[in-house]
């Protein structure tokens, strides 16, 4: 049988869910194909969303009309704002989620979404006609035709699990690998390679001595992931727990190194640099006598815990004995061991910025198959791929986010311009404009753009306008209201800041590190009256947004000037204007890389590793610049 759709999304992980939802919400008749409907949006590793830079991506997904933030708020069992000791540009939200409820919540959203159908099956073949993807064929020999296909296969393409010397074919533990697609794509000229990731043991909480661990409770303030006016902290809030490995534990781990797939030659692919296995830690940091571990709850209705910091592919008996050498885990029982997994990925420099492959029209890649790691990075790519798959079917300009607009823009530009030689994880340090890309203002940066193309709906846009009007009113008040020393100095001294020598605008007082709008409102009744005008349900969020803009106004303006200068180079298009191999004045490396990556603009060309300033100057001269 044959069925017809506009967009087909293959794989229902975090990238696939966002891709399918975006395409369907924009009006495309969409099909989401997954091997197991009970594993939709499965949190394959830790049951947490967000973290450094990752939390900003989730806020951006939400601001654009995606669902990861909403689902996380609905299922969070602990919330924390990381990096509070640093400036707001570095603040990053993170939440522990109830793993089972996270799946149920996502499935409920997708099953009730207009324009979206779900099919349980394995895709084994793409239908390609005249250099363009036209559909897929499944393991049941069902043909689905479509104008665009988004592949979001995660770790399932020829996945191979390792536990000691035991090897198991699969995409996750006890789940089959996906076969056929990689081989077909190779035959079509797509370059592929292998990567590795891993996950820790899952522990039975009934066997843990919690009284010998340090408790880490969450925070219960107004912060959340979604900008929508939805409830959060709905579930019972649970603590995480910390402890440390010790020398006895390390000695047992060293015993197992001859059987470690990482050290006996079984695994040849590269794993994530910033999430090393416990065996890698004891080898790389041999002088360390302990490593911190975090025990994270999997949900409010289960005894299952995730042991963050103990990722391993060592034999089962070594993992268990090493854990039992730690006092809090001396009686530990586990639900399953840690394991490593190798899987196929595709060189992302074969993609355009809209995540469409250069070789095959209307075929999009998103998520871990592009060489990234993390739910958030996958979700951001999936959203962009789903939007652009819809655009390819119905017409319009590609949806591309700039490096000064979103961490998602930084992520995709890094992938398609620089490529990857190890699993890519987002950090704030990767963004040159991180003061512009704060977690508090993703809605201000992105929701208008999404609303104009029809993805963000009216209720989201109305909340944005309300927030902006209230925020800007506070800032205007601070810019125009004058304060006099005789009325405020005694209060300023109590706050630990110098008294005024003369009158000034309230804005200048807010700039001081010791002051906030709230503590100044206790000294300035007119400011209190202004703050009381803010909608009560979002009062803290809006006041915080106004305060950040005031305190960082100078830095924000300076960074925006730099971004505007760089964006002039983004406007100089070079795609299709050069036969790079014929430009002998370019270095050999430059000719090869420019030909392979085929950058759209001078700015993108300048970010390709190995392209020198002199190479860029040659191109500018040839353009008459």
Swiss-Prot record:
Predominant place of localization: cytoplasm
Residues reported in the UniProt entry to bind FAD: 11-16
Subcellular location per the Swiss-Prot or TrEMBL entry: Cytoplasm
Similarity comment: Belongs to the MnmG family.
Species: Parabacteroides distasonis (strain ATCC 8503 / DSM 20701 / CIP 104284 / JCM 5825 / NCTC 11152)
Function: NAD-binding protein involved in the addition of a carboxymethylaminomethyl (cmnm) group at the wobble position (U34) of certain tRNAs, forming tRNA-cmnm(5)s(2)U34.
GO MF entries: flavin adenine dinucleotide binding
Swiss-Prot/TrEMBL cofactor(s): FAD
Protein name per the record: tRNA uridine 5-carboxymethylaminomethyl modification enzyme MnmG
InterPro entries reported for this sequence: FAD/NAD-bd_sf, GIDA_C_N, MnmG, MnmG-rel, MnmG-rel_CS, MnmG_C, MnmG_C_subdom, MnmG_C_subdom_sf
Segment forming the signal sequence: none
Binding site for NAD(+): 271-285
């Amino acid at each position: 049988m044959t069925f017809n759709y506009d967009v087909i999304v293959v794989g229902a992980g975090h990238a696939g869910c966002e891709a399918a939802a975006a395409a369907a919400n924009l009006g495309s008749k969409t099909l989401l194909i997954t091997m197991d409907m009970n594993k939709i949006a499965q949190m394959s590793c830790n049951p947490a969303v967000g973290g450094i830079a990752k939390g900003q991506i989730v806020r951006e997904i939400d601001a654009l009309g995606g669902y990861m933030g909403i689902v996380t708020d609905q299922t969070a069992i602990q919330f924390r704002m990381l990096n509070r000791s640093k400036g707001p540009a570095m603040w990053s939200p993170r939440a522990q989620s109830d793993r089972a409820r996270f799946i149920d919540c996502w499935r409920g959203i997708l099953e009730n979404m207009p324009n979206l159908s779900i099919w349980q099956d394995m895709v084994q073949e793409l239908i390609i006609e005249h250099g363009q993807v036209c559909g897929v064929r499944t393991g049941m020999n069902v043909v689905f035709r479509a104008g665009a296909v988004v592949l979001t296969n995660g770790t399932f393409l020829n996945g191979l699990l390792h536990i000691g010397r035991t090897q198991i074919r699969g995409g996750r533990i006890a789940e089959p690998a996906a076969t056929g697609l990689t081989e077909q794509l190779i035959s079509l000229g797509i370059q592929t390679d292998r990567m590795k990731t891993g996950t820790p043991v899952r522990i039975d909480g009934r066997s843990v001595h919690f009284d010998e661990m340090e408790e880490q409770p969450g925070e219960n303030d107004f912060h959340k992931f979604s900008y929508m006016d939805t409830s959060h902290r709905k579930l019972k809030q649970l603590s995480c727990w910390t402890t440390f490995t010790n020398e006895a534990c390390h000695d047992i781990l060293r015993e197992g190194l001859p059987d470690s797939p990482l050290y006996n030659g079984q695994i040849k692919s590269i794993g994530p640099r910033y999430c090393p296995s416990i065996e890698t830690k004891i080898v790389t940091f041999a002088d360390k006598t302990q490593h911190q571990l975090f025990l994270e709850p999997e949900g409010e209705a289960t005894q299952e815990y995730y042991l963050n910091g103990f990722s391993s592919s060592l034999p089962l008996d070594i993992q268990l004995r090493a854990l039992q050498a730690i006092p809090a885990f001396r009686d530990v029982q586990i639900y399953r061991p840690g394991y490593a997994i190798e899987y196929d990925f595709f060189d992302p420099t074969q993609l355009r910025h809209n995540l469409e492959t250069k070789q095959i029209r209307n075929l999009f890649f998103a998520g871990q198959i592009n060489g990234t790691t993390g739910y958030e990075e996958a979700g951001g790519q999936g959203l962009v791929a789903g939007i652009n798959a819809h655009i390819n079917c119905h017409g319009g300009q590609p949806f591309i986010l700039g490096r000064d607009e979103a961490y998602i823009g930084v992520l995709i530009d890094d992938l398609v311009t620089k490529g990857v030689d190890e699993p890519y994880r987002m950090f704030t340090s990767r963004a040159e404009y991180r003061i512009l890309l704060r977690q508090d203002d993703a809605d201000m940066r992105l929701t208008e753009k999404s609303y104009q193309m029809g993805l963000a709906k009216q209720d989201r846009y109305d909340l944005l306008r309300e927030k902006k009007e209230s925020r800007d009113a506070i800032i205007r008040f601070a810019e125009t209201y004058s304060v006099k020393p005789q009325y405020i100095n005694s209060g300023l001294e109590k706050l630990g800041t110098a008294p005024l020598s003369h009158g000034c605008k309230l804005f200048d007082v807010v700039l001081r590190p010791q002051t906030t709008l709230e503590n100044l409102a206790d000294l300035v009744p007119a400011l209190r009256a202004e703050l009381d005008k803010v909608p009560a349900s979002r009062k803290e969020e809006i006041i915080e947004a106004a305060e950040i803009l005031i305190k960082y106004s100078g830095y924000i303006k300076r960074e925006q000037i730099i971004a505007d200068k760089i964006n002039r180079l983004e406007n100089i298009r070079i795609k299709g204007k050069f036969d790079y191999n014929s430009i002998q004045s370019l270095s050999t490396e430059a000719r090869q890389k420019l030909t392979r990556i085929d950058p759209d603009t001078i700015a993108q060309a300048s970010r390709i590793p190995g392209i020198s300033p002199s190479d860029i100057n040659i191109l500018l001269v040839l353009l008459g610049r």
